[in-house]
Amino acid sequence: MKQAILTQIRRLGGNTDGVTGESLQADLAAIVFKNPLYPAGYVAELIGVAEFWEQHQPLYQTDRPAFYQRLLAHFFADQELPYGQAFFRNFLFTPFKEDSPDYGELAGLVTPDEIRQVVAGADLDFMCICYSYGFPDHYFVCLTDADQENPTVYGTDHEVFFSELTKEGTLEAFFNGFITPEEFLAAATKHLENGKAA
């Protein structure tokens, strides 16, 4: 996996200590996030920030550094309150590999040939890497992608699981599409200092 991807994962709060470069599958499986991921577009809405401010006004008025520390801890906790964030969850999905736990899961929904119209890869073995509250709500890579350093990310939605697929770009572009905790805090601070809490 490209070093730039690993660097961005760490900037986003992920742990890459277990990444060895052995294989794409092993590297993706070794990545750990204990926090959600916020897409870059989140800063335009900052869903939940005003409500958090309303609930913590006394702290905001008396100790802004503590308020912002608590704000960051709240929004980057491993929780699933619907703020428009995404969640890194790395699990193997092998619906066409005989004797795998997923074998046959897509039977009657989509064929390997239909998937190959969008997905490039010798074997259709996938690592699901993320889900979100948006559309699509599941993201994955094909483990036999020709570019093992920076594979293509695909998207699908639970309502049309794998019968409708979209190319979302490279893995590097995918992770670059999220904001860091520092970027989140800067946007929230600007919003509160210049707007609602002024």
For every predicted segment, state its role:
Residues 1-134:
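A surface-exposed partner-binding patch
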Residues 78-197:
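Long, low-complexity, intrinsically disordered segments enriched in glycines and aromatic residues
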